[in-house]
Every structure is written in structure tokens, then in C-alpha cells.
A protein has these predicted regions:
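His/Met- and acidic-residue-enriched segments that coordinate or traffic transition-metal cofactors
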Residues: 2-10, 17-105
């Protein structure tokens, strides 16, 4: 699953913003990628655990946002099922990361 997720993100990152601006799905994917990249742009603190938890939250949220675009615009049943699985898994992992950050200020 991780390999697929990273492949989706890498492919989406290769598309220049606005390149497919006429297509609603492309616009939604571009917006999701731009949000994720902006939210992930932060200077590391030197605390690997905190940096990992902090940076993974927007990364996972980006995956959720892209999966929601697939559910809204995609047709392939296998990809739609994968998108639903990604949303469920990533939401759980975000909750774990947020809980860790709260316990480790």
C-alpha cells in the first residue's frame, strides 16, 4: 500500500500546477498537492521523532485529499476501493501522530 501511495504522490508531483486546469479532477488533485506541499514545508527542529510526527500529518492529509478526489471523480472500482482504504488508514495514523505530539510536547 505504501508503494502505491508514494507512486501516486510522485506522479501527481510531476504534473506542473495548472497543466490540466480545465479538468475538475486535475484541479482538485493540483489543489491537494499544493496544500500538502505548503503544509509540509517546515524547518526540521533536530528532534527526529517530533519532526517525523509533525511532517507526516500533512503528508497523510494530502493522501486523504487525493483519495477523496479519486472517490469523487474516479471510475475504476479497484482504485476507488484503494482510495477508501487509504482514507481509513491515513485518518487512523493521523490520530496516532496527533496523540503522540500531545503526549510529547
Amino acid at each position: 500500500m505504501w508503494t502505491r501511495l508514494f507512486l501516486i504522490i510522485a506522479l501527481a508531483a510531476a504534473i506542473p500546477p495548472g497543466a490540466l486546469a480545465q479538468d475538475p479532477a486535475a484541479e482538485a488533485f493540483n489543489a491537494a498537492m499544493e496544500r500538502m506541499m505548503a503544509d509540509m514545508h517546515m524547518a526540521p527542529t533536530g528532534d527526529a521523532d517530533r519532526d517525523f510526527a509533525t511532517m507526516m500529518i500533512p503528508h497523510h492529509q494530502g493522501a486523504i485529499d487525493m483519495a477523496r478526489v479519486e472517490l469523487e471523480h474516479g471510475d475504476d472500482p479497484a482504485l476507488r476501493a484503494l482510495a477508501a482504504e487509504i482514507i481509513e488508514a491515513q485518518e487512523k495514523e493521523i490520530a496516532v501522530l496527533k496523540a503522540w505530539l500531545e503526549k510529547n510536547p
